[in-house]
């Protein structure tokens, strides 16, 4: 149960912060945001605030921000349509009744002759009992369509995605991944405040019970200064030697309470994979890195850790694309849930660390220039900036549709790999 709650909380935060970035920059640019959704599929919960419908949906596979103009409008008025009009106190059309006009007895029913809801915001037509006097009505920029008793706000061109400059559109698309990096930095800052920041020297933190380190007599705050004939000055040097010597006795010199002591330990053997995904055996002795409280160091740690994690993920992604790493090592929702279950059992700090890493992963993946991802859409905005004119919407739509289908296929393959690896 704890894992389920942790997974839902983690998923909700990662997706919400990503989509919130898109939402905020869309609204700052003056775009009409029709919906802010967490999840896909049927709605579980919804409410409307400041023009936007906020929804939580059943399938936890992402989220989206639906901006006016990105997709064809569902409701389209054409000459010959019979519609009902309701007006505000200024005499402007405030509601356009598309059907079920009998439920709106005070609506003025007309037959549409001409309509422009993009630029001029007018509706022209004739009353049903008078086909000689052509009437013209000004439409309020926030007027509502009413169809099947559901209200949908009209979207004048100046509120649509395509009406904004390439810079504003690019920023709206980039804002989602950007917020994932901001979240990661914030989490690392929180970790720095809670547990301190890692010290550069090979200083031991917590000693795990029933491990070679405990059996050899290591204590927290011991500082490793030498292994064999090699001087040790950093944590990376210490862990590298331990990893490379599973089952081999290592003679170490430590500093404890200002005095040097000799101590020997035999690293245990643990299964792992190398940088290309091949199984290897590494050495472990069961110690955590030492930490210290440092206000300035906390901020540096947050940024450095985000940068290091970003670099690592990009390198792994490059190896995947070039075939150096098998697609079988990819994890989908099932694999991420299983990993979350293992992380939750190791403590809150590790759960925060795992959340930060996934947030960076989400940000990077969305910036990859693939169809249906933020990076793919940024690619089209960039091409428009270079060409001086946009790609035909029909061509871009096909590109994203095919890409989305391929991504869904990849998700199915990855999920099946997870199921085989974990359950079969």
From Swiss-Prot:
Keywords of the record = Cell membrane, Hydrolase, Membrane, Metal-binding, Metalloprotease, Protease, Transmembrane, Transmembrane helix, Zinc
Q: A Pfam family name for this chain?
A: Peptidase_M50
Q: Which PROSITE patterns match?
A: ZINC_PROTEASE
Q: Which residues bind Zn(2+)?
A: 18, 22
What general EC class does the enzyme of this chain belong to? hydrolase
Enumerate the SUPFAM superfamilies for this protein. PDZ domain-like
Q: Which GO terms describe its molecular function?
A: metal ion binding; metalloendopeptidase activity
Domain PDZ span(s) in chain numbering? 184-269
Q: Which cellular components does GO assign to this protein?
A: plasma membrane
Transmembrane feature ranges:
5-25, 174-194, 317-337, 351-371, 396-416
Catalytic residues in the record: 19
Q: What is its EC number?
A: 3.4.24.-
* Superkingdom of this protein's organism: Bacteria
Query: Which InterPro entries is this protein grouped with?
Result: PDZ, PDZ_6, PDZ_sf, Pept_M50_Zn, Peptidase_M50
The cofactors required by this protein are:
Zn(2+)
- Write down the membrane topology: Multi-pass membrane protein
UniProt GO BP: proteolysis
Q: What does this protein do?
A: Is responsible for Site-2 cleavage of the RsiW anti-sigma factor. This results, after a third proteolytic step catalyzed by the ClpXP protease, in the release of SigW and the transcription activation of the genes under the control of the sigma-W factor.
Q: Which family does it belong to?
A: Belongs to the peptidase M50B family.
Q: Which PANTHER family match?
A: MEMBRANE METALLOPROTEASE ARASP2, CHLOROPLASTIC-RELATED, REGULATOR OF SIGMA-E PROTEASE RSEP
Q: What is this protein called?
A: Zinc metalloprotease RasP
Organism of origin = Oceanobacillus iheyensis (strain DSM 14371 / CIP 107618 / JCM 11309 / KCTC 3954 / HTE831)
Gene name of the encoded protein: rasP
């Amino acid at each position: 149960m704890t894992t389920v709650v942790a997974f839902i909380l983690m998923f909700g935060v990662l997706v919400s912060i990503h989509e919130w970035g898109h939402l905020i920059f869309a609204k700052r640019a003056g775009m009409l945001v029709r919906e802010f959704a967490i999840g896909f599929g049927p709605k579980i919960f919804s409410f409307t605030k400041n023009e936007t419908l906020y929804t939580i949906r059943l399938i936890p596979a992402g989220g989206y921000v639906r901006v006016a103009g990105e997709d064809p409008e569902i409701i389209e008025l054409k000459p010959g349509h019979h519609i009902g009009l309701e007006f505000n106190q200024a005499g402007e059309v405030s509601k356009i009744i598309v059907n079920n006009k009998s439920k709106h007895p005070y609506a003025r029913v007309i037959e549409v002759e001409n309509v422009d809801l993009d630029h001029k915001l007018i509706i022209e037509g004739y009353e049903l009992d008078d086909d000689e006097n052509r009437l013209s009505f000004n439409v309020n920029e926030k007027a509502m369509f009413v169809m099947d008793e559901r209200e949908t706000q009209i979207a004048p061109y100046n509120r649509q995605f395509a009406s904004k400059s390439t810079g504003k559109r690019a920023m709206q698309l980039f804002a989602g991944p950007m917020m994932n990096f901001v979240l990661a930095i914030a989490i690392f800052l929180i970790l720095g405040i809670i547990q301190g920041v890692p010290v550069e020297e090979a200083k031991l933190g917590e000693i795990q019970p029933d491990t070679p380190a405990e059996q050899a007599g290591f204590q927290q705050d011991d500082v490793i200064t030498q292994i064999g004939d090699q001087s040790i000055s950093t944590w990376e040097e210490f862990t590298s030697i331990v990893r490379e010597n599973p089952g081999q006795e290592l003679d170490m010199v430590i500093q404890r309470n200002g005095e040097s002591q000799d101590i020997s330990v035999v690293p245990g053997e643990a299964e792992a994979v190398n940088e290309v995904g091949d199984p290897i055996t590494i050495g472990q002795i069961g110690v955590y890195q030492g930490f210290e409280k440092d206000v300035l160091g906390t901020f540096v740690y947050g940024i450095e850790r985000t940068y290091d994690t970003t670099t690592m993920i990009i390198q792994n992604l490059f190896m995947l694309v070039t075939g150096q790493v098998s697609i079988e090592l990819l994890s989908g929702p099932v694999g991420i849930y299983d990993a979350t279950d293992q992380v939750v059992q190791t403590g809150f700090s590790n759960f925060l660390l795992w959340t930060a890493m996934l947030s960076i992963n989400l940000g990077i993946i969305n910036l990859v220039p693939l169809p249906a991802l933020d990076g793919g859409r940024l690619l089209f905005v960039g091409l428009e900036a270079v060409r001086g004119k946009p790609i035909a919407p029909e061509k871009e739509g096909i590109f994203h549709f095919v890409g989305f289908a391929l991504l869904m296929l990849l998700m199915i393959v990855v999920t099946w790999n997870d199921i085989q690896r974990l359950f079969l």
